[in-house]
């Protein structure tokens, strides 16, 4: 739909580069997409999870206007919904909230393998928003001296999302950071600002230790499993899991803080 609009030459070149990139990446990622679908990762999601479909109420954020008319657009890999919200937060000038949301979702789901698809979905979702804005722009008149305020706003949105999509497809700097301290020393508190400042994924030993024993991240592990979760053997398993997950994050193209 975007390519059918009378875009200026600069935006048309950007769009062509993005279309070429998404096609190449889609082909490269196809085996992973197929494998995740076979493993049951595709499920009923929101399908249109941008900030225009989210409201902050007194008891927390509430989603609305999920896609109901098309199962093909609603039954998707959850990382596609996660990417949509992260992308839109960045488009609205709050990438920090996007990184905190992503890390919270990863801790809850444990789906670090899905990070291999994140960049592709980020770009795809930015192009979706550019397309929606482009349709509004095309319907209200093109940019120019006589353009309406609505057309100008739509055109600026097209530019914003195209620019963001082009930025999101670029390789990211990767690195491995380690935080060390005894239990209860404040590692989580101290490293939380770094998650957004450095735009990275954080792996928490206590969360992954609990996951190995079938506990939720917020579960009281001492009360449920006594000392068994903190034996030397359990610690070795936890460290091995952290190493494997750190490798997964780095291979997906993201920095990681352990």
Where are these regions (language model features)?
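Conserved lysine of the Walker
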Residues: 187
């Amino acid at each position: 739909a975007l390519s059918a609009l009378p875009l200026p030459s600069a935006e048309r070149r950007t769009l062509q580069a993005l279309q070429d990139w998404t096609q190449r990446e889609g082909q490269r990622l196809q085996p992973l997409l197929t494998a995740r679908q076979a493993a049951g990762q595709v499920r009923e999601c929101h399908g249109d999870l941008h900030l225009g479909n989210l409201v902050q109420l007194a008891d927390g954020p509430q989603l609305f206007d999920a896609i109901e008319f098309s199962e093909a657009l609603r039954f998707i890999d959850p990382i596609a919904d996660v990417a949509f919200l992260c992308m839109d937060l960045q488009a609205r000038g709050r990438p920090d909230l996007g990184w905190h949301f992503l890390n919270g979702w990863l801790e809850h789901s444990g789906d670090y393998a899905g990070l291999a698809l994140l960049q592709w979905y980020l770009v795809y979702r930015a192009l979706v928003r550019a397309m929606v804005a482009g349709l509004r722009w095309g319907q209200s008149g093109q940019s120019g001296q006589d353009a309406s305020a609505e057309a100008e706003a739509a055109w600026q949105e097209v530019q914003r999302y195209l620019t963001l999509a082009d930025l999101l497809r670029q390789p990211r700097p990767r690195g491995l950071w380690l935080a060390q301290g005894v239990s209860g020393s404040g590692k989580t508190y101290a490293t939380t600002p770094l998650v957004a400042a450095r735009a990275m994924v954080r792996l928490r030993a206590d969360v992954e230790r609990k996951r190995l024993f079938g506990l939720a991240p917020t579960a009281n592990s001492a009360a449920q499993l006594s000392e068994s979760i903190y034996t030397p053997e359990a610690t070795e398993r936890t460290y091995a899991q952290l190493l494997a997950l750190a490798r997964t994050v780095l291979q997906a193209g993201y920095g990681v803080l352990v």
